[in-house]
Swiss-Prot record:
Record-given protein name: Aspartyl/glutamyl-tRNA(Asn/Gln) amidotransferase subunit B
A matching Pfam family: GatB_Yqey
GO MF assignments: asparaginyl-tRNA synthase (glutamine-hydrolyzing) activity; ATP binding; glutaminyl-tRNA synthase (glutamine-hydrolyzing) activity
PANTHER family attached to this UniProt entry: GLUTAMYL-TRNA GLN AMIDOTRANSFERASE SUBUNIT B MITOCHONDRIAL AND PROKARYOTIC PET112-RELATED, GLUTAMYL-TRNA(GLN) AMIDOTRANSFERASE SUBUNIT B, MITOCHONDRIAL
Role, per record: Allows the formation of correctly charged Asn-tRNA(Asn) or Gln-tRNA(Gln) through the transamidation of misacylated Asp-tRNA(Asn) or Glu-tRNA(Gln) in organisms which lack either or both of asparaginyl-tRNA or glutaminyl-tRNA synthetases. The reaction takes place in the presence of glutamine and ATP through an activated phospho-Asp-tRNA(Asn) or phospho-Glu-tRNA(Gln).
Primary enzyme class: ligase
Family under the similarity heading: Belongs to the GatB/GatE family. GatB subfamily.
Catalyzed reactions per annotation: L-glutamyl-tRNA(Gln) + L-glutamine + ATP + H2O = L-glutaminyl-tRNA(Gln) + L-glutamate + ADP + phosphate + H(+); L-aspartyl-tRNA(Asn) + L-glutamine + ATP + H2O = L-asparaginyl-tRNA(Asn) + L-glutamate + ADP + phosphate + 2 H(+)
SMART domains: GatB_Yqey
Source organism of this protein record: Francisella tularensis subsp. novicida (strain U112)
Domain of life: Bacteria
Gene: gatB
GO biological process annotation, one example: translation
InterPro entries to which the protein is assigned, alphabetical: Asn/Gln-tRNA_amidoTrfase_suB/E, Asn/Gln-tRNA_Trfase_suB/E_cat, Asn/Gln_amidotransferase, Asn/Gln_tRNA_amidoTrase-B-like, GatB, GatB_Yqey_C_2, Gln-tRNA_amidoTrfase_suB_CS, Gln_synth/guanido_kin_cat_dom
UniProtKB keywords: ATP-binding, Ligase, Nucleotide-binding, Protein biosynthesis
Length: 473
């Protein structure tokens, strides 16, 4: 019998907010256990939730980016279950009428273009974390993550292969990073995926019994987990057994899925509206204001880059999002191609020599633009701009002060440069004669000597012009 794979996905993205969904606790990753947990996060009596406006804004941005409907009225609900890392005994989530509904994302596979329907995306708070092995023989509980804002993105069961799933996840991962709503760090849990997989005989309309796969933190492992689970379910059914509705854990080391617990249905969670939170009302004016500030989608950004840059340059920017964001700020002022050279050749190469990673904070875009402006005004040379960048990296201060400190201000006095050039020509009569005899490549020799004699301070454009004039006399 031929079996068809049917998959729906639930992707949890951690929204990039400074504070939690309903409390003022910080959301920074990797802090010492339980140092970022407010009374509300710990479920202590007498505490009330206050919704994070930035989380709502980011959810709306996502909805607009996937052409979804934004609910004008949505509600927060309590999802009730008991687990050690859920101190309140319930999770604040959204059940009916979530904030984002009926979106779509187009993917490219070996079989061509396919549209994946997004059923919903809803806001919810993350749970805490059980920590094993930190205390010998005990399980500790770290509530730093409890209350962190999540957007759970749920698709319809539109996937028919592992290839389609991976293509969708990569596209979604790229999208949320480009939108600036999630950092996409899978190792830190910022982008997590649950796979709901069932099989059915080819041509049958009715769905089979699904298993939910958890604990998959890389695209490669997702592909392997799906292929293993598909083969397992085929084996179960073809041997006369029944697939059980359950949650299964993927073990990357053993490359297998193992039963974790019975899979609950929605009614098991006894959802009901959270009495401590008012309905979430989103106006048309609010949606329009966000539309005006929407960043470009990855495909839109790529199209702009391809108009101005070479293939390799486009690929570099698209695969280095922080650099691309920085580059865009420079490009809008000085143009796409010059900006690429300044950011990659001048800035990044200088950072590499200083053994520093790229960060937009090391040399802010406005500082680089100030250095570029000094070159454009002939205050410093292009070559000396790197020295200014290097000094700023080492000891940030006013650019004008750095130029003065390093003595890099260009000499643009025509009389002084001409006298310098005349002296160099007089000191090199043979080379001057060879130039006049047709060896025009010697032009660079005289320019180089003039720049060396001026310690790099002479205006290169003027040096070139004056050398040419003097040699052609």
């Amino acid at each position: 019998m031929n079996w068809e794979m049917v998959i729906g996905l639930e992707v949890h993205i951690q929204l990039s907010t400074k504070s939690k969904l309903f409390s003022t606790s910080a959301t920074k990753y990797g802090q010492h256990q339980n140092t970022q947990a407010a009374f509300l996060d710990l479920g202590l009596p007498g505490t009330l939730p206050v919704v994070n406006k930035e989380a709502i804004r980011k959810a709306v941005i996502f909805g607009l980016a996937v052409d979804a409907k934004i609910s004008k009225d949505s509600f927060f609900a309590r999802k009730n279950y008991f687990y050690p890392d859920l101190p309140k005994g319930y999770q604040i989530s959204q059940s009916t009428n979530p904030i984002v509904q009926e979106g779509r994302l187009d993917i490219e596979t070996s079989k061509g273009l396919k549209t994946i329907r997004i059923e919903r995306a809803h806001l919810e708070e993350d749970a805490g974390k059980s920590v094993h092995g930190y205390i010998a023989g005990e399980t500790g509980l770290d509530y730093n993550r409890a209350g962190t804002p999540l957007l759970e993105i749920v698709t319809y069961p539109d996937f028919r292969s592992a290839e389609e799933v991976v293509a969708y996840l990569k596209k979604l991962h790229q999208l949320v990073k480009h939108l600036g709503i999630c950092d996409g760090n899978m190792q830190e849990g910022s982008f997590r995926c649950d796979v709901n997989l069932s099989i059915r005989p080819q041509g049958q309309a009715k769905f089979g019994t699904r298993a939910e796969l958890k604990n998959i933190n890389s695209f490669r492992f997702i592909d392997k987990a799906i292929e293993y689970e598909y083969a397992r379910q085929v084996s179960v059914l073809e041997s006369g057994g029944e697939v059980v509705q359950e949650t299964r854990l993927y073990d990357a080391d053993a490359n297998e899925t193992r039963s974790m617990r019975a899979k609950e249905d929605a009614f098991d969670y006894r959802y009901f509206p959270d009495p401590d939170l008012l309905p979430l009302v989103i106006t048309d004016e609010y949606i329009e204001s966000i539309k005006k500030q929407m960043p470009l989608k990855p495909e839109e950004r790529e199209a702009v880059y391809r108009e101005h840059l070479a293939e390799q340059e486009v690929e570099f920017l698209l695969s280095n999002l922080e650099i691309a964001d920085y580059y865009d700020k420079v490009a809008v002022v000085i143009g796409y191609k010059p900006a690429y050279n300044w950011v990659t050749v001048d800035l990044i190469s200088t950072l590499n020599r200083a053994e520093k990673e790229f960060s937009s904070d090391v040399v802010p875009a406005e500082i680089l633009l100030e250095i570029i402006a000094n070159v454009q005004k002939d205050i410093i040379s292009q070559a000396n701009a790197k020295k200014v960048i290097a000094e700023y990296i080492d000891a940030p201060s006013a650019i004008e002060a750095i130029i003065e400190k390093l003595g890099l201000k260009q000499v643009s006095d025509e009389g002084m440069i001409r006298e310098l050039v005349q002296g160099i020509i007089a000191a090199n009569p043979q080379q001057a004669a060879d130039f006049k005899a047709g060896k025009t490549k010697l032009m660079s020799f005289f320019v180089g000597q003039a720049m060396k004699a001026s310690k790099g301070k002479a205006n290169p454009k003027q040096v070139n012009q004056i050398v040419q004039e003097e040699l052609n006399k």
